[in-house]
UniProtKB/Swiss-Prot annotation:
Subunit structure: Homodimer or homotetramer.
One Pfam family recorded for the sequence: Spermine_synt_N
Organism lineage: Bacteria, Pseudomonadati, Pseudomonadota, Gammaproteobacteria, Enterobacterales
The gene coding this protein: speE
Protein name: Polyamine aminopropyltransferase
InterPro entries, per database record: PABS (IPR030374), PABS_CS (IPR030373), SAM-dependent_MTases_sf (IPR029063), Spermi_synthase (IPR001045), Spermidine_synt_N (IPR035246), Spermidine_synt_N_sf (IPR037163)
Length: 288
């Protein structure tokens, strides 16, 4: 039997992970990124951009449930949601499950990501692109948040790592723009890497976000194919009560929403804001 091909992630120089490739479904370099989707027996379809795993069919639900339901249920009455990135459609899928949301705007820099994900990762969007509340904007995220006249209750930055096209979504210009188009009491969240290996990302985001928001923190979730431990999500708002809501309040909102989740639940919501001591110490040691 011929040995299967292997795909090696290139995010880190001295260590990393690989996947056996059963079948390459799509591989093309666009104007912005090198995109590949392949099949793996353990994780189903895997999508990678510029040598870094972005999502897999098997564990994507953890990431998308936590990035969506934590801010939306903490907010409690979000009507207008902005997704930056998220071209695979899974973040959109989770937002559409909130029936009280009236409009969902997704800004994706690369139209190619959307088109090939609709074809090759249909389970991710699960038909959500056809939701009448949804609007797709092909634009740079920084440009959009600094130019739009729309305002939002929750902004979800489903960004890649701060390399290549995704780097701009970790800048002060982006965070300032998000604050500009966020309604009073609104919440901004963003993926912030695996903090054990990418701690500087969290520190840098915390420092920049603190210039624009009065309450900045992080919450976490364990996602197997994001190599290196616990994934960290940035959290920013001017309502410091939202990060400290009781499990009972979240439970009541969760039950009222009718959501059925595979990872998220109210107890996980509350616990996700408990950070490891090494991250707390690193954040506390930074100059104010």
């Amino acid at each position: 039997m011929a040995e299967k091909k292997q795909w090696h992630e290139t995010l880190h120089d001295q260590f990393g992970q690989y996947f056996a490739v059963d079948n390459v479904l799509y591989h093309e370099k666009t104007d912005h990124q090198d995109l590949i989707i392949f099949e793996n027996a353990a994780f189903g379809r895997v999508m990678a951009l510029d040598g870094v795993v972005q999502t897999t069919e098997r564990d994507e639900f953890i990431y998308h449930e936590m990035m969506t339901h934590v801010p939306l249920l903490a907010h409690g009455h979000a009507k207008h949601v902005l997704i930056i990135g998220g071209g695979d459609g899974a973040m959109l899928r989770e937002v559409t499950r909130h029936k009280n949301v009236e409009s969902i705007t997704m800004v994706e820099i690369d139209a190619g990501v959307v088109s090939f994900c609709r074809q090759y990762l249909p389970n991710h969007n699960a038909g959500s692109y056809d939701d009448p509340r949804f609007k797709l904007v092909i634009d740079d995220g920084v440009n959009f948040v600094n130019q739009t006249n729309q305002t939002f209750d929750v902004i979800i930055s489903d960004c890649t790592d701060p390399i290549g096209p995704g780097e701009s979504l970790f800048t002060s210009a982006f965070y300032e723009g998000c604050k500009r188009c966020l309604n009073p009491g609104g919440i901004f969240v963003a993926q912030n890497g695996v903090c054990f290996l990418q701690q500087e990302e969290a520190i840098d985001s915390h420092r920049k976000l603190s210039h624009y928001f009065s309450d900045v923190g992080f919450y976490q979730a364990a996602i197997p194919t994001y190599y290196g431990g616990i994934m960290t999500f940035a959290w920013a708002t001017d309502n410091d009560a939202l990060r400290h809501l009781s499990t009972e309040i979240i439970q009541a909102r969760f039950l009222a929403s009718g959501l059925k989740c595979r990872y998220y639940n109210p107890a996980v919501h509350t616990a996700a804001f408990a950070l490891p001591q090494y991250l707390q110490d690193a954040l506390a040691s930074q100059p104010s």
